[in-house]
UniProtKB/Swiss-Prot annotation:
It comes from Staphylococcus epidermidis (strain ATCC 35984 / DSM 28319 / BCRC 17069 / CCUG 31568 / BM 3577 / RP62A). One of its GO terms (cellular component) is plasma membrane. SUPFAM superfamilies: ATPase domain of HSP90 chaperone/DNA topoisomerase II/histidine kinase, HAMP domain-like, Homodimeric domain of signal transducing histidine kinase. Autophosphorylated. Its main location: membrane. The chain crosses the membrane at residues 13-33, 157-177. Pfam families: ArlS_N, HATPase_c, HisKA. The gene is arlS. This is Signal transduction histidine-protein kinase ArlS. It is an enzyme of class 2 (transferase).
Length: 456
């Protein structure tokens, strides 16, 4: 199993290796070119001395040339050896007594320039033939490369030291920098562990002055807010659903106990208890169906068969049916003169109409006047449903589409609602690309404005 590394150590290791490698390569390249330049300079210096010696033999005879004359043509750390044609050494002189070159020269196959190592020191050796009127032989110039080699070694040591110092500095800076970068990540990790232990607390308060990590913190805070909100909604949903199911179950249980005690002998009690129990079972069934509908997602919606629905005809059909059931209500319709086609599942649209009209009727028990308007405006299909009932307080407007939320909680059960209708309606509208707006004034009116885009 591969051992996991901390991000800051991994970051520090990578940046340090990259920096060290870069500096090392850079120094090696510089040393390579500098070494080549210095070597050329050493060769040029030896060439000049060798040429001066050759010119000296062309201007003077061998007997007139002294050791001082030869030394005057030499630079520091150089030695000159003069041989005749037979390879006999005639003169050997140097301006540096520390030179210890003792290699024999092969005059049959002489190399003009070569490097020879003697006693641990490299020497540049230049062999030149001398042909003058009075002398014929060879000059051998020995140029010590000890200073050159020492300088190159020093350059390597300096480069290595510089690389190590730069590496240490880079490692320190990388550690500090990576610690600053990973600090919000570590803090968020600790925060998540705290949330796991203690539940949701305050948001993460941290500023790093780095755009990426600050965005990460903002995203984390937003995500935690959404998770907390979702968690609270889920908890509230479970509590509300439990409450909604508990009430009819308690009623059913009470009437079953009543039947067990007296209903066996009293047909009236039996009939009443059975009717109430059936009504509560129907209420539970409807509640479960609506809860299942709310859990359906867009994938399930895509499976539904959609068709072009004439919304004016559907509204007229629903209003006609409701008028027969509720003759005491007035349904005022102002429908668009031209047919309006909406691509939607017909059952969903019928359910949508019934939810809004039923909701309007529940909260308009005094005037009993429901107004429905349709129009086509700015490539949008508009449906307005207005009641003249109790209205909705402004503080409640943002919550009316929440599950189990009721404006008038004291009257909700007597009106037969369970607080899921508007949540279902909102989901149907959203799944079909529409939107809902609400306008309301207390003790005056409430208008639900439903709009759908016109699709070609």
């Amino acid at each position: 199993m591969i051992k996991r590394q901390k991000l800051k150590y991994k970051w520090m290791l990578i940046t340090t290796l990259i920096t060290f490698t870069t500096i090392l390569l850079f120094c090696l390249i510089i040393i390579f070119f500098l070494k080549d330049t210095l070597r050329s300079s050493e060769i040029d210096e030896a060439e000049r001395s060798s040429n001066d010696i050759a010119n000296l033999f062309h201007s003077k005879s061998l007997s007139d040339i002294s050791a001082l004359d030869l030394n005057a043509s030499l630079e520091n750390f150089q030695e000159i050896l003069i041989y005749d044609d037979k390879g006999r050494k005639l003169i050997q002189t140097s301006n540096d007594n520390t030179l210890a070159y003792d290699n024999k020269i092969d005059f049959k196959h002489p190399e003009r320039i070569h490097i020879h190592r003697s006693h641990g020191i490299n020497y540049l050796v230049i062999t030149e033939p001398i042909r003058s009127k009075e002398f014929s032989g060879y000059s051998v110039l020995v140029h010590s490369l000890q200073n050159y080699d020492n300088l190159v070694k020093s350059l390597y040591i300096v480069a290595l030291a510089f690389g190590l110092i730069a590496t240490i500095i880079t490692a320190g800076v990388s550690y500090i920098f990576s610690s600053q970068i990973t600090k919000p990540i570590v803090t968020m990790s600790n925060k998540m562990n705290q949330i796991r232990r203690d539940g949701f607390q305050n948001k993460l308060e941290l500023t790093t002055n780095y755009e990426e990590t600050d965005n990460l913190i903002d995203t984390f805070n937003e995500m935690m807010y959404q998770i907390e909100e979702s968690f609270n909604q889920q908890r509230q949903f479970v509590e509300d659903a439990s409450h909604e199911l508990r009430t009819p179950l308690q009623i059913i249980q009470g009437h079953l106990n009543l039947i067990q005690r007296w209903g066996k002998k009293d047909p009236a009690v039996l009939e009443e208890s059975l009717n109430i129990s059936i009504e509560e079972v129907n209420r539970i069934t409807k509640l479960v169906e609506e809860l299942l509908l709310l859990t359906k997602d867009r994938v399930n919606h895509n499976v539904l068969e959609c068709e072009n629905v004439d919304i004016n005809s559907e509204i007229q059909s629903r209003v006609k049916s409701l008028q027969h059931l509720h003759p005491d209500y007035t349904f005022e319709t102002h429908l668009a003169t031209k047919p309006i086609q909406l691509k939607i599942n017909r059952h969903q649209f019928e359910q949508l109409l019934l939810i809004f009209i039923d909701n309007a009727m529940k909260y308009d028990t005094e005037h009993k006047h429901i107004k429905i308007v349709t129009q086509l405006k700015n490539k949008m299909i508009m449906i307005d449903i207005t009641d003249h009932g109790m209205g909705i307080p402004k503080a409640d407007l943002e919550f009316i589409f929440d599950r189990f939320y009721r404006v008038d909680k004291s009257r909700a059960r007597s009106q037969g609602g369970n607080g899921l209708g508007l949540s279902i309606a909102e989901k149907i509208v959203q799944l079909n690309g529409g939107m809902i707006q609400v306008e309301s004034e207390l003790q005056n009116y409430t208008t639900f404005k439903i709009s759908f885009p016109v699709l070609n």
